[in-house]
Curated annotation (Swiss-Prot):
Record-stated family: Belongs to the elongation factor P family.
Keyword Magnesium applies: no
Changes after translation: May be beta-lysylated on the epsilon-amino group of Lys-34 by the combined action of EpmA and EpmB, and then hydroxylated on the C5 position of the same residue by EpmC (if this protein is present). Lysylation is critical for the stimulatory effect of EF-P on peptide-bond formation. The lysylation moiety may extend toward the peptidyltransferase center and stabilize the terminal 3-CCA end of the tRNA. Hydroxylation of the C5 position on Lys-34 may allow additional potential stabilizing hydrogen-bond interactions with the P-tRNA.
Localization of this protein: Cytoplasm
Domain of life: Bacteria
InterPro entries: Elong-fact-P_C, NA-bd_OB-fold, Rib_uL2_dom2, Transl_elong_fac_P/YeiP, Transl_elong_KOW-like, Transl_elong_P/YeiP_cen, Transl_elong_P/YeiP_CS, Transl_elongation_fac_P
Stored Pfam families: EFP, EFP_N, Elong-fact-P_C
The protein's annotated pathway: Protein biosynthesis; polypeptide chain elongation
Gene: efp
Source organism per UniProt: Pectobacterium atrosepticum (strain SCRI 1043 / ATCC BAA-672)
Protein name, UniProt field: Elongation factor P
The organism's taxonomic lineage, starting at the top: Bacteria, Pseudomonadati, Pseudomonadota, Gammaproteobacteria, Enterobacterales
Length: 188
């Protein structure tokens, strides 16, 4: 893999730091009037999603990470692992429940997700930006009950709970933004 000097650090670059993959979110090169130049770097740990801020000397260099974002179809959950398949090679990957994390509530059969692989091992799963799911449970919206926010909680067929308008009923299909967890529209 390529080696990157701290001068080459750019937003989006994926590197190995302390034997783990990180994605650089921002890098600021600082050249003080006195002393050695350095780079102030904000990066995200890909295994956990935590953010770290580090300072590197201008002479420091790090290895590039062998990290690949791949489109894969979600197949099923066997209780212990989530199974994904590459749509062209039909190669299947098992992903641990802790790796899928909060994304699990947005997964539907055959949904195309972005699976991040590090050395061929899945480390993160991003669900599609929007899903269409049926409402399995919600309170009936009473006519004239518009005091307050004008929304009510609804449980989707995936198990996720989202806030929907009062006019939405059980059995209707709604479109939801998985990045924010917000209702977008009804699907006709």
């Amino acid at each position: 893999m390529a080696t990157y000097s701290s001068n080459d650090f750019r937003s989006g670059l994926k590197i190995i730091f302390e034997s783990e993959p990180y994605a650089i979110e921002s890098s600021e090169f600082v050249k003080p009037g006195k002393g050695q130049a350095f780079a102030r770097v904000k990066m995200r740990r890909l295994l956990t999603g935590s953010r770290v801020e580090k300072t590197f000397k201008s002479t420091d260099s790090l290895e590039g990470a062998d990290v690949v974002d791949t489109n894969m179809n979600y197949l099923y959950n066997d209780g212990e692992f989530y199974h994904f398949m590459h749509p062209e090679t039909f190669e299947q990957h098992q992903v641990e429940e802790k790796t899928v994390g909060d994304s699990a509530k947005w997964l539907q059969d055959n949904a195309e997700c972005i699976v991040t692989l590090w050395d061929g091992r899945p480390i993160t799963v991003l669900p599609p930006n929007f899903i269409e799911a049926e409402i399995t449970d919600t309170d009936p919206g009473l006519k004239g009950d518009t005091a307050g926010t004008g929304g009510k909680p609804a449980t989707l067929s995936t198990g996720a709970v989202v806030k929907v308008p009062l006019f939405v009923q059980i059995g209707e299909v709604v479109r939801v933004d998985t990045r924010s967890g917000e209702y977008v529209s009804r699907v006709k």
